[in-house]
């Protein structure tokens, strides 16, 4: 009986050891990706990466722009992040050598992209360009006996009081691109005077803290005119809203977001493979589904009701952190 128990115990221990060994051998390599993208875009990227790389445990995690920028600036090359899928160029530029030079890596070809979107440092690759627009609920304006505005100066007329929504540049990249474009076209002093006048016509408690504030205000009928992102307005139109998309003479302000690898991790072959797939498949699919504005020289995408000829504005200084810090320092709201 003792012999039988001994044999059973030995077999049990052997099975446990084999199970433990198998578990260890099946442990997947973790690759961590951070992005400031909307949740549905992150979900799509996560699904594509999981299907392409079942041998890896790839985590695509959301962080707000400010949170991710601060995290990467504080942690530098020692961060847990391997790949940045999407972050505003201004903040990527500020990271300097904390992000890797990408020349020579698989599938990295800066000649594929519009030259104005390619950084001189070659440390990040364009992911999306997203423009701002004036979204108008014409029916609400008609109800109030008001015409559709045709220029920025119309927005500061007293008859539009309480009908306009714009994000605060201090807390929203959307608000900042409108602000910067106004500075570039009118000069800093005149631009600040303009936004002082516009503040008197804003709905609710003034400039919204979130970039999605204006489109939400339009949906709720709290505003008739929203300074928002083009894709936000198109999304609502495709869901049944009767909005008009306007671009004034100054053109559409815009921002560019890009992808990067943390410095020191660009030599890891697994990270190289994931980053290459991000460029060749995930980025184009994101354009096809959500953000069709052109980033490639010879490749375009279309989405129902999305403007195809967007007149882009003068966005000098958009990637310059010193310019942004200076302008936000004098912004009083």
PLM segments and residue spans:
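Extracellular/periplasmic bilobal clamshell ligand-binding domains
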Residues: 299-333
């Amino acid at each position: 009986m003792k012999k039988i128990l001994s044999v059973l115990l030995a077999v049990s221990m052997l099975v446990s050891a084999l199970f433990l060994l198998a578990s260890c051998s099946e442990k997947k390599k973790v690759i961590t990706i951070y992005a400031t993208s909307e949740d549905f875009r992150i979900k799509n990227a996560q699904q594509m990466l999981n299907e392409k790389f079942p041998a890896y445990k790839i985590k695509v995690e959301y962080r707000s722009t400010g949170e991710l920028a601060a995290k990467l600036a504080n942690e530098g090359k020692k961060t847990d992040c391997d790949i940045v899928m999407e972050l505003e160029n201004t903040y990527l530029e500020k990271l300097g050598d904390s992000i890797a030079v990408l020349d020579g890596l698989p599938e990295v070809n800066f000649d594929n992209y519009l030259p104005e979107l390619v950084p001189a440092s070659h440390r990040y690759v364009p992911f999306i360009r997203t423009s701002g627009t004036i979204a108008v609920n014409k029916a609400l304006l008609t109800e109030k006996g008001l015409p559709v505005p045709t220029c920025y100066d119309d927005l500061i007329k007293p008859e539009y009081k309480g009908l306009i929504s714009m994000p605060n540049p201090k807390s929203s990249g959307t608000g900042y691109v409108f602000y910067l474009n106004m500075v570039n076209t009118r000069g800093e002093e005149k631009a600040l005077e303009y936004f002082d006048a516009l503040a008197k016509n804003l709905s609710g408690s003034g400039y919204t803290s979130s970039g999605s504030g204006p489109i939400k205000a339009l949906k709720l009928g709290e505003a008739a005119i929203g300074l928002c992102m083009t894709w936000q307005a198109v999304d609502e139109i495709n869901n049944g809203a009767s909005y008009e998309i306007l671009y004034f003479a100054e053109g559409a302000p815009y921002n560019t977001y890009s992808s990067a690898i943390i410095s020191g991790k660009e030599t890891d072959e697994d990270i190289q493979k994931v980053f290459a797939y991000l460029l060749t498949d995930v980025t184009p699919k994101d354009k096809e589904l959500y953000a069709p504005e052109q980033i490639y020289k010879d490749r375009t995408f279309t989405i129902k009701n999305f403007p195809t000829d967007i007149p882009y504005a003068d966005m000098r200084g958009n990637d310059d952190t010193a310019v942004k810090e200076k302008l936000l320092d004098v912004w009083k709201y």
